[in-house]
Design a protein with these regions (language model features):
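Residue-level signal for inorganic ion chemistry
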Residues: 7, 56, 83, 122, ...
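Acidic-glycine-rich active-site phosphate/pyrophosphate-binding loop
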Residues: 10-14, 88-89, 192-206, 250-262
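Glycine-rich phosphate-binding loop of actin/hexokinase-like ATP-binding domains
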Residues: 65-70, 74-90, 133, 137-172, ...
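Hydrophobic or amphipathic alpha-helical targeting/insertion segments
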Residues: 70, 92, 96-97, 101
Length: 280
């Protein structure tokens, strides 16, 4: 979607990236090609002047991540959150650190849907990942990397790994160590809205855009929906519909009660500094 600086929608493009029936994984290169396609179509047709494009931001689903090597090449497909790989790995994490401790750090009930147990599965079962993984990136992280050359993630995306310390806004050394993952294999976490770099020159030429276009960290999709709907204060909520229906209420503090997380409610940073949200 292309917006003016005042938030007026100027153009819209949509692209599917179908997978085989019953598959629990997705090709990250295919997703990036679709992203390029919708960017190109958003700035074609005369509704948007290419020279006026100032920034590109990306929002995506969470959990699923792709391992890349030093050159940014994908080492395997992304394992989606619906895939059952990672069940035994999640149990091992709980046995090592305890469910209560993990929840106290991540503000989430540990589950195999998150990135960390799936990263463990990939590292233990795919030799290319075990030998060459340089970064583990979620979908938005991967697209932003391909656009800018920078390895980053947003706080809201990082929370979907079950390896992020919500209170300290950093990767948890204890969780990564328990999973056998090095800290440097994770992208740098930044606040939503951070300018992470400029559009790569070769992509600028391909898309007909300026290489001064800023690449801006977006957010996990439900937080983006809340922000776009104007849910910017504690006590407000949005009901978003799409592939799933999700109610996103906003709080002015971190909620860490055992009853909250045991019922599978999370607590994640909002796009507005000092606010937090959950998904229901």
């Amino acid at each position: 979607v292309a917006f003016s600086e005042n938030g007026v929608q100027l153009s819209l493009a949509y692209s599917e990236y179908p997978t085989s029936a019953g598959a629990g994984d997705m090709n990250a290169d295919t997703i990036f090609d679709a992203a390029k396609d919708v960017i190109a179509r958003c700035v074609s047709g005369g509704k948007v002047e290419r020279s006026d494009v100032a920034a590109i931001s990306v929002t995506s689903f969470g959990e699923a991540c792709v391992p890349v090597d030093r050159e940014g090449n994908c080492l395997c497909d992304m394992i989606m959150y619906t895939d059952r790989r990672g069940v035994s790995e999640n149990e091992r994490l709980i046995e090592k650190l305890g469910r209560k401790y993990i929840s106290s750090v991540t503000c989430a009930n540990p589950a195999p849907m998150y990135s960390l147990p799936k990263i463990m599965w990939m590292s233990e079962n795919i030799s290319a990942v075990r030998e060459s993984a340089f970064r583990f990136l979620q979908a938005a992280d991967f697209i932003c990397y391909r656009l800018s050359g920078e390895f980053t993630t947003t706080y809201t995306q990082a929370c979907r790994t079950d390896a992020f310390d919500v209170e300290r806004l950093r990767w948890s050394p204890e969780l990564l160590e328990a999973a056998g993952i090095r800290m440097e294999q994770m992208p740098d976490p930044v606040p939503n809205g951070t300018v992470i770099g400029l559009l790569r020159r070769e992509l600028a030429a391909e898309l007909g855009l300026s290489d001064t276009v800023k690449i801006v960290a977006g957010s996990q999709d439900q937080i983006a929906a809340a922000t776009g709907a104007g849910v910017l204060s504690a006590g407000q909520a949005v009901d978003g519909t799409g592939s799933v229906e999700c109610i996103t209420p906003v709080f002015d503090r971190i909620i860490k009660s055992e009853g909250f997380t045991s019922n599978n409610y999370v607590c994640v940073p909002h796009s507005v500094v000092g606010l937090y949200a959950t998904y229901a």
